[in-house]
């Protein structure tokens, strides 16, 4: 039990320490936005602008991917509905054959 409490304390302090090192994106090297290129590493308004552009780009890519995924699922649904209709016709055809066999008896 003591080990569990010690671990919890370690993780919470580790999270606090790492969150203190994060800064605003694009504010320079060593902060949350550093290392993304020379403009972002320099910090300042150009770094923040570059970080904002990058975030906007990735949000747009995510929206495009979600739209493509939604379209794919809609196509899959349409395909399966058509397959259900085809199989239902097959079932009806076989039921008709069974009725015909019963009628012939």
Curated annotation (Swiss-Prot):
Asked if the keyword Transit peptide belongs to this entry, the reply reads yes
Where are the annotated segments for N-terminal inhibitory region? 22-51
Gene3D superfamilies the UniProt entry points to = Single helix bin
Q: Which UniProt keywords apply?
A: Coiled coil, Mitochondrion, Transit peptide
* Ranges annotated as biased composition (Gly residues): 25-38
- GO CC field: cytoplasm; mitochondrion
- Give the region (Disordered) as residue ranges: 17-52
Q: Effect of gene disruption?
A: Defects in circulating erythroid cells. Embryos are anemic despite normal expression of the erythroid cell markers. The erythrocytes from embryos that survive to adult stage exhibit hypochromic, microcytic anemia. Histological analysis of adult haematopoietic tissues does not show morphological defects. Defects are due to changes in the mitochondrial pH-and consequently the redox potential-to change to a level that reduces [2Fe-2S] cluster-containing fech activity, thereby reducing heme synthesis, resulting in hypochromic anemia.
InterPro entries in alphabetical order: ATPase_inhibitor_mt
User: What is a biological process (GO) this protein takes part in?
Assistant: erythrocyte differentiation
Gene Ontology molecular function terms on file: ATPase binding; ATPase inhibitor activity; protein homodimerization activity
Coiled-coil ranges from the UniProt annotation: 58-105
Checking Pfam families in the record gives: IATP
Q: Does the keyword Chloroplast apply?
A: no
Region Antiparallel alpha-helical coiled coil region: what ranges?
73-105
- Localization: Mitochondrion
Question: Which family is this sequence assigned to?
Answer: Belongs to the ATPase inhibitor family.
What remark about domains does the record contain?
Forms an alpha-helical dimer with monomers associated via an antiparallel alpha-helical coiled coil composed of residues 73-105, leaving each N-terminal inhibitory region (residues 22-51) accessible for interaction with an F1 catalytic domain. The inhibitory N-terminal region (residues 22-51) binds the alpha(ADP-bound)-beta(ADP-bound) (ATP5F1A-ATP5F1B) interface of F1-ATPase, and also contact the central gamma subunit (ATP5F1C).
Q: How does it assemble?
A: Homodimer; represents the active form and is present at a pH value below 6.5. Homotetramer; represents the inactive form and is present at a pH value above 7.0.
Describe the task this protein carries out. Answer: Endogenous F(1)F(o)-ATPase inhibitor limiting ATP depletion when the mitochondrial membrane potential falls below a threshold and the F(1)F(o)-ATP synthase starts hydrolyzing ATP to pump protons out of the mitochondrial matrix. Required to avoid the consumption of cellular ATP when the F(1)F(o)-ATP synthase enzyme acts as an ATP hydrolase. Indirectly acts as a regulator of heme synthesis in erythroid tissues: regulates heme synthesis by modulating the mitochondrial pH and redox potential, allowing fech to efficiently catalyze the incorporation of iron into protoporphyrin IX to produce heme.
Name of the protein this chain belongs to = ATPase inhibitor A, mitochondrial
Q: Which organism is it from?
A: Danio rerio (Zebrafish)
């Amino acid at each position: 039990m003591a080990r569990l409490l010690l671990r919890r304390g370690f993780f919470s302090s580790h999270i606090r320490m790492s969150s203190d090192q994060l800064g605003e994106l694009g504010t320079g090297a060593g902060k949350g936005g550093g290392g993304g290129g020379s403009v972002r590493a320099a910090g300042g308004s150009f770094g923040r602008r570059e970080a904002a552009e990058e975030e906007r780009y990735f949000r747009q890519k995510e929206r495009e991917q979600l739209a493509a995924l939604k379209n794919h699922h809609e196509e899959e649904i349409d395909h399966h509905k058509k397959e259900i209709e085809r199989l239902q016709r097959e079932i009806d055809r076989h039921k008709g054959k069974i009725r015909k066999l019963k009628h012939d008896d």
